[in-house]
Each structure stands twice: as structure tokens, then as C-alpha cells.
Amino acid sequence: MQDNETDGRDVPTGHAVIQGYLKTLDGSPGVYRMLDAQSQVLYVGKARNLRARVSNYARPSGHSGRIARMIRETASMMFLTTRTETEALLLEQNLIKQLKPRYNVLLRDDKSFPNILIAKDHPFPMLKKHRGKKSEKGSYFGPFASAGAVNRTLNQLQRVFLLRTCSDATFESRTRPCLLFQIKRCSAPCVGRVPAEDYAELIGDAERFLQGRTTKVQANLAEQMQAASEAMEFERAAALRDRIKALTQVQSSQGINPRGVAEADVIAVHLEGGQACVQVFFIRANQSWGNRDFFPRTGAGAEEPEILEAFLAQFYDDKEPPRMILLSHPVDNPDLVGQLLSERAGRKVTLGVPQRGEKAELVENAARNARESLARRMAESATQNRLLAGLAEAFELDAAPKRIEVYDNSHIQGTNAVGGMIVAGPEGFLKSQYRKFNIRGAAGAQGDDFGMMKEVLTRRFERLLKEDPERKTDAWPDLLLIDGGAGQVSAVQEILQELGVDDVPFIGVAKGIDRDAGKEEFHRPGEPPFALRMNDPVLYFVQRLRDEAHRWAIGAHRAKRAKAVSATPLDEIPGVGAARKRALLAHFGSAKAVARAGVPDLCAVEGISETMAQSIHDYFHGS
């Protein structure tokens, strides 16, 4: 890959600048960047033939309004040549994610999707929800559109197949069945209520169910019930009858169940008023595993094929694509996108725009959902903009804030202290930009709320000053809301003055004398506190912001506290990660038992080599 960079800051912007680059380009594939007079990237694009693509921009006419504006602002260009067009597409999407150019389509929601994992690193496999890298041993099923969709399916699997969901440590410590056994959601393998062979059969049935082979599962259960009845094992027959009934209820409660589509993502885009909604339905094993809507950033003039092509490349950047992707509109480069996705999946991925039949109905359903989601979002956005304008008026800001950061701390007498930051703006809560701060300084141990707030804001703004000192991105806040009164406001003022940040307004939100919601007092530096009318929509808006920050901080504190409670000496041993820790605890039952074990006993644990066993033994015995 070659990098040819040219700086055009001293030449005029527009067609003349672009024309000047043509003589330096050949017909190689690659990626180009268009920069403005301040060297900010306006646009990143790919090309099969760089010279041909750039010559299109050099034409004085025939461009959409969006492209014409971009050309007028272009002061310089940068080029990267690649070996193939597929490589250029991959590089283009990586640069778009990294640089976030103003004129590109950008997918803003990059959250991972949950899966169901049947973990098989234990004689009695465990059923659980899983996110992230598929590094654990077992069978994965997904993706599901949301945690709620996974939880519903897990609940169904427990009802029908009676699989355990407890941790290995809990499993090993049980001496009698838990409540899940009593309510017929688990077969209690922890205390030997089900033989290993029978439990393995339950696991097999659950896997067949998740693979869409429900008819076979139902037939197997019916055969077992008949056999139990003939053998006069009436209690077992009744239990099997209940499982068949539960399975029938599960099948009837499932929504979209396409017969002719075993595995696909159905993706539709709706474009209106310069905004876009992309709706994705996940179909696996002939079942719909939920849907998710996305609102990519698009410039005025962007069209459906461009939006879908950018979405596909960015969405599947860290997700395995299914065998088939059904689209509402054709993309500009279907062969290229299909090749890229096939390379990522390690198998053939087909793109299609169905015109009739069941597949077309699935796409139409996704398109209808995209249309309705965008209408709701536009209505919510109008309300949000009115609230932001009201906030600016109430707090005497120069303009309606586009980025509000709200801060809160959470701890119990200084233990497991955490600071939380949430972000809100015209599009509502921006959850992908929420942050947690583990309190490192003495303020946490002392339970000093003012000191904690100083630490959190110091870390936040020192990073901003380091990464974006000229404030060229939208990472800088227009308003800070702090949970607290005059003391917190003084602490914030002190730290911002020390950092030289004197133009970011901040407000302290205190609950007032009675500490009742609705009687909040607002504090600004050097001014007496003031209040808003009880029925003022802005007051409710600020309460929502404060409560969300409180929820986020408390959640972070609880997670940190839970982690501290579950910590064991095994966490301190070099080379013992999560998988080895699970294996050791499952084998020995407790960290104390691991500490007492000899090297031969440790070697008997799966994944523990003789060298690692010696290291573990030496750690506990001081050798």
C-alpha cells in the first residue's frame, strides 16, 4: 500500500484544486480524502480507479447540492493506493469510523449484539447470555437484537429444556435444589437429580431448537412421553407432557417465522427530511430474533444506495454476516460489498433485493418499521429541541446546547467509589458516549464528594485538552450539570480555572431544603440559587438528566462492588485468566481448596499445564 500525501492549503478551494491532482494519479484502486482549508477531513471515498473518480469531482457541473458544497470547500486531497478494490473499501470504512468526516454516512451505534451461549467447559453445560469475543468453549446462537430478546429466549429454553443458568462456583457449592427446580425451570444437575446422559440429551434438544429443528424436538419429546407411559413411569410422562405444552406455547408466541428463510438479515432504509433510519431484522433458524433501528448520520443529498452501502460495510465490521442479506434498495457496488462480507464471514454471503414472495414481504415489513421509527424520532427530536431551547433560556446560555454532560458520584462510605458521566443532546441520551471513572485518589477512600468531582473533571478535561485542544470535534460540552449545590459548584469552578477552561457553563442541581423532587435549586458560580416553576417542562427535563446520571453512577458502583465481592486470590496469579479461574473453581470448589492442592492435583484441571500448576502452587506456598 502506498501513501501519497499532498498539502494544498496555499491554493484556492474547489475544482481547480482537484484538477491539479489528476496528473499525479494513475488508474490504481485506492482511497482519497478531501480536506478543507483548516486540514479537516471533509470526505473519505474509495475508487476502483483513482484518476477516473477524482476527474469526476473536477467537472464544473453535474453534481448534487451536497457534493457541490463539498467540492467548494476542498482545499487539498490525500491519496492511499491499495492492491484491490476490496482492500480500498475496507480501508475507507476504517477511516470513516476514525475520522468521522462531515460529508460521509456514519453509523453512530456500534454496540455489540448479545448471543446465547451453551458453555461446554463443564460436564453439565450452562446456558447464558454472551456479548463480545467468542472465546469461550461452547455453542453460540445469535445475534439477538437486544438483551430483552435474549432474556425471553433464555426463559423459554429454561421452561422447555430445564437447563442450568447458575455459575460454576454456585453449581459446585449447592447441597439441595434451588428455587428454579421448584418452579420447573431447571433439572437440578447440581445435586444429581438428572443423570449426565439425560442432561446431555436436554442440551442436544436445546441446540436443535435454536437451530430451528423444532419439529424434531417435539417428535422426540412425544416419543419419550409415550415410552414413559407404556413403562408406567407416570411422573416422568407428566413432566414430558408439561415440556411439550411449554414448547407449543413458545412456538405460538413467536412472531415472524418465515418458512423459506432460514438465515438472513433483512435491512431496509427510509429517508426523509435529510434523516435516515435503517431497520435490521435478524432471522436465524427460521425464527425472528428481534429487530433494531439505526439512525446513521447522513448529509443532505445522500441517497438510499449510498446509505445502505456505507451501513453494510460499517455494521459488519465487527459482526459475522449471515449467509443472506435482504435489502430494500440495491447498493451501488453489490459485487464488491458481497466479496468483502464473504471474506469476513469465510463463506459466501449473498445480497438481494427481492421483488415478490415471502422475502419481499419481509423487506416491506422492515421498511414499514423504518418509516415508523423515523417518524417517531423526528417527533421526539422536535420536542427535544424545544426543551433544549427552554433550557438555554432558563439558564441564560448563549444558544441551545448540543452536548450536555451530567456528572454524579456513587460510593458507600468511600468504598468502590465511581464517578459517572452521561451525555445528552438534540437526539436524546447518547448512551454510547457515557463514561465511568474509577476514583483513584484519596478522595474516594475518604468519602470526599468534592474531591471525587475534582478528580473526575480533571481527568475528563485533561483528556479533552490533550486530544482536541482546538475544539475541532463535537466532544466538547456546551453545558455541565453537576449533582450538588454550592460546594460542588465551587469545586467545579476551581478545577476548570486551574485547567484554563473558562468558557464552558456549568450548573449545580440541588434538591432543596426538603430534598423533594420538584423543589430543586440551581446554583451558578457567584450567584444566589434560583428555582424553576413546579410545572415547567424544563424542570422535568433537568430531573430526567440528573436521574439518568444517578442511575448510571449507581450501576457502575454496584458492578464494581460485585466484582470486588467475587474477587479471589486467583485473580492475582500471573497467567490465570477468567477461563482458568473458572476451571479451577469448578474443579476444587473454592480458592482455599486450590491453595491447598498439590501440583499433581492442579495438573488434573483442564487447561492447567505442569508449568502453570507449579506457578499456582508457588504463589500460595511462597516458593
UniProtKB/Swiss-Prot annotation:
User: Is Cytoplasm among this UniProt entry's keywords?
Assistant: yes
Keywords linked to the UniProt accession: Cytoplasm, DNA damage, DNA excision, DNA repair, Excision nuclease, SOS response
> Got any disulfides in this one, which pairs?
none
The beginning of the lineage is: Bacteria, Pseudomonadati, Pseudomonadota, Alphaproteobacteria, Rhodobacterales
Q: Which PANTHER family does the annotation name?
A: UVRABC SYSTEM PROTEIN C, UVRC/OXIDOREDUCTASE
Chain's role = The UvrABC repair system catalyzes the recognition and processing of DNA lesions. UvrC both incises the 5' and 3' sides of the lesion. The N-terminal half is responsible for the 3' incision and the C-terminal half is responsible for the 5' incision.
Query: What is the similarity comment for this entry?
Result: Belongs to the UvrC family.
Is DNA damage among this UniProt entry's keywords? yes
Q: Sorted alphabetically, which PROSITE patterns does this protein's record hold?
A: GIY_YIG (PS50164), UVR (PS50151), UVRC (PS50165)
Name the UniProt record assigns to this protein: UvrABC system protein C
**HAMAP family on file:** UvrC
List where in the cell it is found. Answer: Cytoplasm
Alphabetical GO biological process terms = nucleotide-excision repair; SOS response
Which intervals hold domain UVR? 215-250
Among the GO molecular function terms of this UniProt record, one is: DNA binding
How this chain assembles, per its entry, is:
Interacts with UvrB in an incision complex.
Q: Which gene encodes it?
A: uvrC
Q: GO CC annotations?
A: cytoplasm; excinuclease repair complex
Fetch the Pfam families from UniProt: GIY-YIG, HHH_2, UVR, UvrC_RNaseH, UvrC_RNaseH_dom
Please give the InterPro entries that the UniProt record associates with this protein.
DisA/LigA_HHH, GIY-YIG_endonuc, GIY-YIG_endonuc_sf, GIY-YIG_UvrC_Cho, Hlx-hairpin-Hlx_DNA-bd_motif, RuvA_2-like, UVR_dom, UVR_dom_sf
Q: SMART domains from the xrefs? A: GIYc, HhH1
